[in-house]
Protein backbone atom coordinates (compact mmCIF):
# COMPACT_ATOMS: atom_id res chain seq x y z
CA UNK A 1 0.00 0.00 0.00
CA UNK A 2 1.28 3.45 -0.90
CA UNK A 3 1.67 6.35 1.51
CA UNK A 4 -1.10 8.94 1.04
CA UNK A 5 -0.50 12.60 1.85
CA UNK A 6 -2.55 15.74 2.14
CA UNK A 7 -0.88 18.45 0.09
CA UNK A 8 -3.38 21.24 0.72
CA UNK A 9 -6.89 21.91 1.97
CA UNK A 10 -8.93 25.07 1.47
CA UNK A 11 -12.40 26.29 2.25
CA UNK A 12 -14.73 29.20 1.94
CA UNK A 13 -15.52 31.28 4.94
CA UNK A 14 -18.76 30.17 6.57
CA UNK A 15 -21.87 32.31 6.23
CA UNK A 16 -25.12 32.13 8.16
CA UNK A 17 -27.80 30.16 6.37
CA UNK A 18 -30.71 32.20 4.98
CA UNK A 19 -29.32 35.54 6.23
CA UNK A 20 -25.68 35.33 5.18
CA UNK A 21 -23.70 36.26 2.10
CA UNK A 22 -24.03 32.79 0.56
CA UNK A 23 -27.84 32.81 0.56
CA UNK A 24 -27.96 33.08 -3.25
CA UNK A 25 -24.79 31.08 -3.97
CA UNK A 26 -25.04 27.59 -5.40
CA UNK A 27 -23.17 24.84 -3.54
CA UNK A 28 -21.53 23.51 -6.70
CA UNK A 29 -20.14 26.98 -7.36
CA UNK A 30 -18.73 27.15 -3.82
CA UNK A 31 -17.01 23.78 -4.14
CA UNK A 32 -15.71 24.56 -7.65
CA UNK A 33 -14.22 27.78 -6.27
CA UNK A 34 -12.30 25.73 -3.71
CA UNK A 35 -11.07 23.31 -6.37
CA UNK A 36 -9.81 26.19 -8.50
CA UNK A 37 -7.96 27.59 -5.48
CA UNK A 38 -6.24 24.23 -4.93
CA UNK A 39 -5.14 24.10 -8.56
CA UNK A 40 -3.84 27.67 -8.47
CA UNK A 41 -2.10 27.50 -5.09
CA UNK A 42 -0.27 24.32 -6.02
CA UNK A 43 0.32 25.11 -9.71
CA UNK A 44 -1.28 21.75 -10.50
CA UNK A 45 -2.05 20.56 -14.00
CA UNK A 46 -5.73 19.48 -13.92
CA UNK A 47 -4.90 16.62 -16.29
CA UNK A 48 -3.10 14.97 -13.37
CA UNK A 49 -6.27 14.75 -11.27
CA UNK A 50 -7.93 11.34 -11.37
CA UNK A 51 -11.21 12.08 -9.59
CA UNK A 52 -13.31 14.69 -7.80
CA UNK A 53 -15.19 13.32 -4.78
CA UNK A 54 -17.72 15.52 -2.99
CA UNK A 55 -19.73 14.78 0.13
CA UNK A 56 -23.03 16.49 0.91
CA UNK A 57 -25.58 15.94 3.65
CA UNK A 58 -28.44 16.45 1.21
CA UNK A 59 -28.28 15.07 -2.31
CA UNK A 60 -31.26 16.69 -3.96
CA UNK A 61 -32.24 20.04 -5.39
CA UNK A 62 -29.21 22.32 -5.66
CA UNK A 63 -27.04 19.46 -4.38
CA UNK A 64 -28.51 16.78 -6.60
CA UNK A 65 -27.59 15.54 -10.08
CA UNK A 66 -24.23 14.15 -8.89
CA UNK A 67 -22.83 17.42 -7.58
CA UNK A 68 -19.34 15.90 -7.53
CA UNK A 69 -19.32 15.61 -11.31
CA UNK A 70 -20.83 19.09 -11.65
CA UNK A 71 -18.05 20.53 -9.47
CA UNK A 72 -15.40 18.93 -11.68
CA UNK A 73 -16.92 20.38 -14.84
CA UNK A 74 -17.58 23.82 -13.33
CA UNK A 75 -14.03 24.09 -12.02
CA UNK A 76 -10.74 24.14 -13.85
CA UNK A 77 -10.64 20.35 -13.74
CA UNK A 78 -12.83 20.21 -16.82
CA UNK A 79 -14.63 17.49 -18.72
CA UNK A 80 -11.84 14.91 -18.53
CA UNK A 81 -11.99 14.60 -14.72
CA UNK A 82 -14.83 12.39 -13.41
CA UNK A 83 -16.73 13.10 -10.24
CA UNK A 84 -18.84 11.35 -7.64
CA UNK A 85 -21.11 12.34 -4.78
CA UNK A 86 -21.60 10.60 -1.45
CA UNK A 87 -23.65 11.07 1.68
CA UNK A 88 -22.82 10.03 5.21
CA UNK A 89 -24.50 13.13 6.62
CA UNK A 90 -22.16 15.12 8.85
CA UNK A 91 -19.15 12.93 8.08
CA UNK A 92 -19.57 13.27 4.31
CA UNK A 93 -16.49 15.47 3.87
CA UNK A 94 -14.31 13.14 5.92
CA UNK A 95 -15.76 10.11 4.14
CA UNK A 96 -14.97 11.65 0.74
CA UNK A 97 -11.35 12.16 1.78
CA UNK A 98 -11.13 8.62 3.17
CA UNK A 99 -12.42 7.16 -0.10
CA UNK A 100 -9.90 9.24 -2.02
CA UNK A 101 -7.07 8.14 0.27
CA UNK A 102 -7.95 4.48 -0.11
CA UNK A 103 -8.10 4.79 -3.91
CA UNK A 104 -4.61 6.28 -3.88
CA UNK A 105 -3.25 3.79 -1.33
CA UNK A 106 -4.44 0.88 -3.47
CA UNK A 107 -2.66 2.22 -6.54
CA UNK A 108 -5.83 2.91 -8.51
CA UNK A 109 -5.32 6.69 -8.45
CA UNK A 110 -2.45 9.15 -7.97
CA UNK A 111 -4.12 12.52 -7.39
CA UNK A 112 -7.66 13.24 -6.14
CA UNK A 113 -9.50 16.33 -4.93
CA UNK A 114 -12.08 15.49 -2.28
CA UNK A 115 -14.14 17.29 0.31
CA UNK A 116 -17.63 18.48 0.97
CA UNK A 117 -20.19 21.22 0.61
CA UNK A 118 -23.52 22.27 2.05
CA UNK A 119 -25.91 25.06 1.23
CA UNK A 120 -28.46 24.65 3.98
CA UNK A 121 -30.10 27.79 2.62
CA UNK A 122 -30.88 26.23 -0.75
CA UNK A 123 -31.75 22.71 0.43
CA UNK A 124 -33.24 22.59 3.93
CA UNK A 125 -36.68 23.92 3.03
CA UNK A 126 -37.01 22.03 -0.24
CA UNK A 127 -36.43 18.44 0.86
CA UNK A 128 -38.48 15.84 -1.01
CA UNK A 129 -40.41 13.94 1.68
CA UNK A 130 -42.34 11.68 -0.69
CA UNK A 131 -42.09 8.09 0.66
CA UNK A 132 -39.41 9.32 3.08
CA UNK A 133 -40.41 7.19 6.07
CA UNK A 134 -40.20 3.40 6.06
CA UNK A 135 -43.14 2.19 8.21
CA UNK A 136 -41.16 -0.72 9.70
CA UNK A 137 -38.29 1.54 10.76
CA UNK A 138 -40.73 4.12 12.06
CA UNK A 139 -42.33 1.48 14.27
CA UNK A 140 -39.23 -0.44 15.40
CA UNK A 141 -36.45 2.19 15.40
CA UNK A 142 -38.21 5.58 15.46
CA UNK A 143 -35.06 7.37 16.59
CA UNK A 144 -33.61 7.02 13.11
CA UNK A 145 -36.02 9.77 12.03
CA UNK A 146 -35.65 12.06 15.04
CA UNK A 147 -34.47 15.62 14.37
CA UNK A 148 -30.87 16.05 15.49
CA UNK A 149 -31.86 18.52 18.20
CA UNK A 150 -34.15 15.94 19.74
CA UNK A 151 -31.29 13.43 19.92
CA UNK A 152 -29.12 16.06 21.61
CA UNK A 153 -31.80 16.48 24.28
CA UNK A 154 -31.89 12.71 24.77
CA UNK A 155 -28.11 12.62 25.27
CA UNK A 156 -28.29 15.44 27.81
CA UNK A 157 -31.04 13.75 29.83
CA UNK A 158 -29.80 10.20 29.52
CA UNK A 159 -26.27 11.04 30.66
CA UNK A 160 -26.95 13.88 33.09
CA UNK A 161 -25.37 16.73 31.15
CA UNK A 162 -26.64 19.96 32.66
CA UNK A 163 -27.66 23.16 30.93
CA UNK A 164 -24.91 24.97 32.84
CA UNK A 165 -22.24 22.57 31.56
CA UNK A 166 -23.49 22.92 27.99
CA UNK A 167 -23.48 26.71 28.17
CA UNK A 168 -19.99 26.76 29.67
CA UNK A 169 -18.74 24.55 26.85
CA UNK A 170 -20.41 26.78 24.24
CA UNK A 171 -18.72 29.82 25.77
CA UNK A 172 -15.37 28.05 25.58
CA UNK A 173 -15.92 27.33 21.88
CA UNK A 174 -16.80 30.97 21.16
CA UNK A 175 -13.83 32.29 23.12
CA UNK A 176 -11.36 29.89 21.53
CA UNK A 177 -12.56 30.72 18.05
CA UNK A 178 -12.50 34.46 18.74
CA UNK A 179 -8.86 34.23 19.81
CA UNK A 180 -7.93 32.07 16.83
CA UNK A 181 -9.71 34.39 14.40
CA UNK A 182 -8.03 37.46 15.92
CA UNK A 183 -4.66 35.72 15.60
CA UNK A 184 -5.28 34.90 11.93
CA UNK A 185 -5.22 31.14 12.43
CA UNK A 186 -7.95 30.54 9.83
CA UNK A 187 -6.54 32.89 7.19
CA UNK A 188 -4.48 30.36 5.23
CA UNK A 189 -7.34 27.89 4.88
CA UNK A 190 -9.98 30.40 3.69
CA UNK A 191 -10.13 31.41 0.01
CA UNK A 192 -12.21 34.60 -0.41
CA UNK A 193 -15.22 34.34 -2.71
CA UNK A 194 -17.25 37.14 -4.28
CA UNK A 195 -21.00 36.72 -3.98
CA UNK A 196 -24.39 38.25 -4.58
CA UNK A 197 -26.74 37.95 -1.63
CA UNK A 198 -30.26 38.97 -0.67
CA UNK A 199 -31.07 41.29 2.23
CA UNK A 200 -34.58 41.89 3.52
CA UNK A 201 -35.62 45.03 5.35
CA UNK A 202 -37.37 43.84 8.50
CA UNK A 203 -39.71 46.81 8.67
CA UNK A 204 -40.87 47.01 5.06
CA UNK A 205 -40.20 43.47 3.88
CA UNK A 206 -38.44 44.94 0.86
CA UNK A 207 -35.63 42.79 -0.55
CA UNK A 208 -32.52 43.88 -2.37
CA UNK A 209 -29.57 42.02 -3.85
CA UNK A 210 -26.09 43.20 -2.89
CA UNK A 211 -22.55 42.36 -3.96
CA UNK A 212 -20.19 41.08 -1.30
CA UNK A 213 -17.14 39.02 -0.42
CA UNK A 214 -16.94 36.10 2.00
CA UNK A 215 -13.37 36.16 3.29
CA UNK A 216 -13.88 35.13 6.90
CA UNK A 217 -16.27 33.14 9.08
CA UNK A 218 -19.37 35.15 9.92
CA UNK A 219 -21.25 32.77 12.21
CA UNK A 220 -19.40 33.23 15.48
CA UNK A 221 -20.42 35.53 18.32
CA UNK A 222 -17.22 36.84 19.98
CA UNK A 223 -19.19 38.84 22.54
CA UNK A 224 -20.96 35.75 23.93
CA UNK A 225 -21.36 35.64 27.72
CA UNK A 226 -22.61 33.01 30.14
CA UNK A 227 -25.43 35.36 31.10
CA UNK A 228 -26.49 35.71 27.50
CA UNK A 229 -26.39 31.96 26.96
CA UNK A 230 -28.41 31.35 30.12
CA UNK A 231 -31.14 33.70 28.90
CA UNK A 232 -31.88 31.66 25.77
CA UNK A 233 -34.97 29.47 25.64
CA UNK A 234 -34.70 25.73 24.89
CA UNK A 235 -34.93 25.11 21.16
CA UNK A 236 -36.25 21.55 20.97
CA UNK A 237 -38.26 20.88 24.14
CA UNK A 238 -40.03 23.24 26.53
CA UNK A 239 -38.20 21.80 29.52
CA UNK A 240 -35.02 21.05 27.57
CA UNK A 241 -31.44 22.25 27.88
CA UNK A 242 -30.33 22.50 24.24
CA UNK A 243 -30.53 26.05 22.90
CA UNK A 244 -29.47 28.04 19.88
CA UNK A 245 -26.44 29.08 21.92
CA UNK A 246 -25.09 25.63 22.81
CA UNK A 247 -25.82 24.01 19.45
CA UNK A 248 -24.09 24.46 16.11
CA UNK A 249 -25.43 27.13 13.83
CA UNK A 250 -27.00 26.53 10.42
CA UNK A 251 -24.45 27.75 7.90
CA UNK A 252 -23.31 27.48 4.28
CA UNK A 253 -19.86 26.71 2.91
CA UNK A 254 -17.51 24.36 1.05
CA UNK A 255 -14.11 22.78 1.60
CA UNK A 256 -11.92 20.74 -0.73
CA UNK A 257 -8.69 18.85 -0.03
CA UNK A 258 -5.87 17.79 -2.37
CA UNK A 259 -4.54 14.26 -1.81
CA UNK A 260 -1.72 12.42 -3.58
CA UNK A 261 0.59 9.51 -3.20
CA UNK A 262 3.75 10.57 -1.40
CA UNK A 263 5.79 9.67 -4.48
CA UNK A 264 3.67 11.88 -6.73
CA UNK A 265 3.83 14.85 -4.38
CA UNK A 266 7.61 14.65 -4.18
CA UNK A 267 7.91 14.20 -7.94
CA UNK A 268 5.87 17.38 -8.46
CA UNK A 269 7.92 19.29 -5.93
CA UNK A 270 4.95 19.78 -3.61
CA UNK A 271 5.27 19.79 0.16
CA UNK A 272 3.18 17.11 1.91
CA UNK A 273 1.44 18.50 4.99
CA UNK A 274 0.19 15.29 6.60
CA UNK A 275 -0.20 11.56 6.11
CA UNK A 276 -3.63 9.97 6.01
CA UNK A 277 -3.33 7.10 8.52
CA UNK A 278 -6.79 5.57 8.79
CA UNK A 279 -10.56 5.89 8.96
CA UNK A 280 -13.31 3.99 10.77
CA UNK A 281 -17.05 4.20 11.23
CA UNK A 282 -19.26 2.65 13.89
CA UNK A 283 -22.95 2.44 14.68
CA UNK A 284 -24.86 3.44 17.80
CA UNK A 285 -28.49 3.88 18.84
CA UNK A 286 -30.07 6.41 16.47
CA UNK A 287 -31.82 8.33 19.25
CA UNK A 288 -28.42 9.20 20.76
CA UNK A 289 -26.52 9.63 17.52
CA UNK A 290 -24.36 12.35 19.08
CA UNK A 291 -22.27 9.82 21.00
CA UNK A 292 -21.12 8.05 17.82
CA UNK A 293 -17.45 9.04 18.31
CA UNK A 294 -17.41 7.03 21.55
CA UNK A 295 -17.62 3.95 19.32
CA UNK A 296 -15.63 4.98 16.23
CA UNK A 297 -12.62 6.46 18.05
CA UNK A 298 -11.63 3.29 20.00
CA UNK A 299 -12.11 1.25 16.83
CA UNK A 300 -9.73 3.55 14.95
CA UNK A 301 -7.09 3.68 17.66
CA UNK A 302 -7.15 -0.09 18.17
CA UNK A 303 -6.61 -0.63 14.45
CA UNK A 304 -3.59 1.67 14.56
CA UNK A 305 -2.11 0.49 17.85
CA UNK A 306 -2.59 3.84 19.56
CA UNK A 307 -4.13 5.09 22.80
CA UNK A 308 -6.08 8.24 23.59
CA UNK A 309 -2.97 9.79 25.14
CA UNK A 310 -1.01 9.26 21.90
CA UNK A 311 -3.24 11.71 20.04
CA UNK A 312 -1.98 15.29 20.27
CA UNK A 313 -5.02 17.17 18.94
CA UNK A 314 -8.70 16.32 18.51
CA UNK A 315 -11.27 17.91 16.22
CA UNK A 316 -14.84 16.86 16.99
CA UNK A 317 -17.60 18.35 14.85
CA UNK A 318 -19.35 19.95 17.83
CA UNK A 319 -22.93 19.60 16.63
CA UNK A 320 -24.22 20.09 20.18
CA UNK A 321 -22.51 20.83 23.47
CA UNK A 322 -24.27 17.88 25.11
CA UNK A 323 -22.66 15.32 22.80
CA UNK A 324 -19.29 17.10 22.83
CA UNK A 325 -19.12 16.90 26.60
CA UNK A 326 -20.21 13.28 26.73
CA UNK A 327 -17.72 12.18 24.07
CA UNK A 328 -14.85 14.14 25.58
CA UNK A 329 -15.40 12.83 29.09
CA UNK A 330 -16.29 9.25 28.16
CA UNK A 331 -13.17 8.96 26.01
CA UNK A 332 -11.12 10.79 28.67
CA UNK A 333 -9.73 13.36 26.24
CA UNK A 334 -7.74 16.26 27.66
CA UNK A 335 -9.79 19.45 27.21
CA UNK A 336 -6.62 21.33 26.22
CA UNK A 337 -6.24 19.06 23.18
CA UNK A 338 -9.92 19.20 22.19
CA UNK A 339 -11.21 21.68 19.59
CA UNK A 340 -8.42 24.02 20.59
CA UNK A 341 -9.57 26.82 18.27
CA UNK A 342 -13.29 26.30 18.69
CA UNK A 343 -15.70 24.06 16.85
CA UNK A 344 -18.99 24.16 15.01
CA UNK A 345 -20.90 25.83 17.84
CA UNK A 346 -18.85 28.93 17.06
CA UNK A 347 -17.57 28.35 13.53
CA UNK A 348 -20.71 26.90 11.93
CA UNK A 349 -21.65 23.47 10.62
CA UNK A 350 -22.49 23.04 6.92
CA UNK A 351 -23.08 19.32 7.22
CA UNK A 352 -21.25 17.93 4.20
CA UNK A 353 -18.23 20.22 4.35
CA UNK A 354 -17.36 20.06 8.05
CA UNK A 355 -15.12 16.98 7.86
CA UNK A 356 -12.88 18.53 5.21
CA UNK A 357 -12.78 21.81 7.14
CA UNK A 358 -11.74 19.96 10.28
CA UNK A 359 -8.95 18.15 8.44
CA UNK A 360 -7.62 21.33 6.87
CA UNK A 361 -7.49 23.07 10.24
CA UNK A 362 -6.15 20.07 12.16
CA UNK A 363 -3.24 19.59 9.77
CA UNK A 364 -2.26 23.25 10.06
CA UNK A 365 -2.54 23.28 13.84
CA UNK A 366 -0.45 20.14 14.24
CA UNK A 367 2.31 21.74 12.21
CA UNK A 368 2.05 25.08 14.04
CA UNK A 369 2.54 23.27 17.34
CA UNK A 370 5.09 20.75 16.02
CA UNK A 371 2.85 17.85 17.06
CA UNK A 372 2.41 14.44 15.47
CA UNK A 373 -1.03 12.81 15.58
CA UNK A 374 -4.49 14.29 15.20
CA UNK A 375 -7.96 12.78 15.03
CA UNK A 376 -10.98 14.20 13.23
CA UNK A 377 -14.23 12.72 14.48
CA UNK A 378 -17.93 13.43 14.39
CA UNK A 379 -21.38 12.16 15.19
CA UNK A 380 -23.53 11.18 12.23
CA UNK A 381 -27.29 11.29 11.80
CA UNK A 382 -29.00 7.91 11.95
CA UNK A 383 -26.75 6.73 14.78
CA UNK A 384 -23.11 6.58 13.69
CA UNK A 385 -19.66 7.89 14.47
CA UNK A 386 -16.80 8.48 12.04
CA UNK A 387 -13.13 9.05 12.84
CA UNK A 388 -9.99 9.72 10.82
CA UNK A 389 -6.34 9.66 11.91
CA UNK A 390 -3.73 12.03 10.48
CA UNK A 391 0.00 12.38 11.09
CA UNK A 392 1.70 15.70 10.47
CA UNK A 393 4.74 15.84 8.24
CA UNK A 394 7.23 17.66 10.44
Feature names for model-found ranges:
Residues 151, 189, 195, 277-346:
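Active-site pocket-lining segment
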Residues 22-111, 116-135, 190-214, 288, ...:
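Conserved beta-ketoacyl condensing-enzyme motif
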Residues 1-27, 224-291, 295, 302, ...:
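Condensing-enzyme catalytic core mediating Claisen C-C bond formation in acyl metabolism
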Residues 56-110, 130-131, 142-150, 223-249, ...:
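Conserved catalytic cysteine-centered active-site region
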Residues 10-13, 24-33, 41, 168-262, ...:
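N-terminal extracellular/periplasmic Venus flytrap/periplasmic-binding protein-like
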Residues 27-43, 67-71, 96, 148-155, ...:
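Short, well-ordered amphipathic alpha-helical segments that serve as non-catalytic structural scaffolds
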Residues 86-117, 156-186, 256-263, 328, ...:
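Active-site-proximal alpha-helical scaffold in enzymes
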